[in-house]
């Protein structure tokens, strides 16, 4: 009885050529700041941070880029600045975090160590005997 499978396996080169011609499947994300970002379809479930705001692929901001006249291009966005403080009830504080001043004293975790000049000469003589 004849085998149903061919004696030679099909060439992978044909599949590679077709894959190169195929368009890259990606989604377009239109953010509130006016920026548009594209990400690969297989990258769902991953988040990213843009201008200090974290975005997740499960949110409602994701839209499929369809192209031509159906493209979700939003031209009504006036501001391209980051919208970090949207609630006016919350005062906008200084974004620079103050750093503690440096001091010449020992850190709290280390006890005060004596100066090497305070040791007697006999200490050094006995140390190096």
UniProtKB/Swiss-Prot annotation:
Modification comment: Phosphorylated.
Which residues belong to zinc fingers classed as unnamed? 33-50
An annotated GO cellular component: host cell cytoplasm
Composition bias type Low complexity, residue spans: 1-12
UniProt-listed InterPro entries = Gemini_AL2 (IPR000942)
What GO biological process terms are annotated to this protein in UniProt?
symbiont-mediated suppression of host innate immune response
The protein's job, in short, is: Strong activator of the late viral genes promoters. Enhances the expression of the capsid protein and nuclear shuttle protein. Acts as a suppressor of RNA-mediated gene silencing, also known as post-transcriptional gene silencing (PTGS), a mechanism of plant viral defense that limits the accumulation of viral RNAs. Suppresses the host RNA silencing by inhibiting adenosine kinase 2 (ADK2), a kinase involved in a general methylation pathway.
Q: What is known of its domains?
A: The zinc finger and the transactivation region are involved in PTGS suppression.
Name of the protein: Transcriptional activator protein
Record organism? Abutilon mosaic virus (isolate West India) (AbMV)
